[in-house]
């Protein structure tokens, strides 16, 4: 009978140890799941609050949705039309205090990359000119203008903002 008590005691100790291992395993799994959920929430919030045009020495650069990033500058290509330079400049200022893209080297590289050129008319109605494959130009301007003494088709004034 004495040997039976030792046997029962050993069984109880093994069951107690197994129960502790099970309890700790559940606790560890719960902590891992909790930290994964927490990191997922932080990542989602981070995407919502992503900086608009953020640049620093770490070479991290973000542009807002519908903007194009090129050479650490954000560009916005309008889809709506404006009447003149002043209207376009005001629309750019409404977009995160951005300024109207001007004739800077970076903009020239970008417009060259996108097959765009800039056309000046010496008045307030000038804008970006898109060169087609056959070198026929479609000036994006709201006034009538003959390019190289040829009659051209015109579209509404489009604009580019940069930040």
UniProtKB/Swiss-Prot annotation:
Keyword presence, Lipoprotein: no
Disulphides: 63-74, 92-161
GO cellular component: host cell endoplasmic reticulum membrane; membrane
Similarity section: Belongs to the asfivirus lectin-like protein family.
Molecular function terms from GO: carbohydrate binding
Sugar attachment sites: 84, 96-97, 103, 109, 115, 129, 135
Location(s), subcellular: Host endoplasmic reticulum membrane
Topology, Extracellular side: 48-163
Matching Gene3D superfamilies: Mannose-Binding Protein A, subunit A (3.10.100.10)
Summary of the function given for this chain in its UniProt record: Down-regulates MHC-I expression by impairing the appropriate configuration or presentation into the plasma membrane of the latter. Participates in viral hemadsorption, which may help viral spread. Reduces the transactivating activity of host TP53, thus inhibiting apoptosis. Non-essential for virus growth in swine macrophage cell cultures.
Region (Lectin-like): 63-162
BP-aspect Gene Ontology terms: symbiont-mediated perturbation of host apoptosis
Membrane-protein topology: Single-pass type II membrane protein
Key word Transmembrane present: yes
Subunit and interaction comment: Homodimer.
Induction trigger: Expressed in the early phase of the viral replicative cycle. Expressed in the late phase of the viral replicative cycle.
Transmembrane annotation, as ranges: 27-47
This protein's UniProt keywords: Disulfide bond, Early protein, Glycoprotein, Host endoplasmic reticulum, Host membrane, Host-virus interaction, Lectin, Membrane, Modulation of host cell apoptosis by virus, Signal-anchor, Transmembrane, Transmembrane helix
Protein name (record): Lectin-like protein EP153R
Cytoplasmic compartment spans: 1-26
Coiled coil location: none
């Amino acid at each position: 009978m004495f040997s039976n008590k030792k046997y029962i005691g050993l069984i109880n100790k093994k069951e107690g140890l197994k129960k502790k291992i099970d309890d700790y395993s559940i606790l560890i799994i719960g902590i891992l799941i909790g930290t994964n959920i927490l990191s997922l929430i932080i990542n989602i919030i981070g995407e919502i609050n992503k900086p608009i045009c953020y640049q620093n020495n770490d070479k991290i650069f973000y542009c807002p949705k519908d903007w194009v990033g090129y050479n650490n500058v954000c560009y916005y290509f309008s889809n709506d039309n404006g009447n003149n330079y002043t209207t376009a400049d005001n629309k750019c200022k409404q977009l995160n205090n951005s300024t109207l893209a001007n004739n800077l080297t970076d903009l020239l590289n970008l417009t060259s990359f996108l097959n765009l050129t800039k056309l000046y008319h010496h008045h307030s109605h000038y804008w970006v000119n898109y060169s087609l494959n056959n070198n026929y130009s479609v000036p994006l301007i709201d006034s009538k203008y003959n390019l190289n003494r040829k009659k051209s088709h015109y579209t509404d004034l489009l604009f580019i903002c940069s930040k």
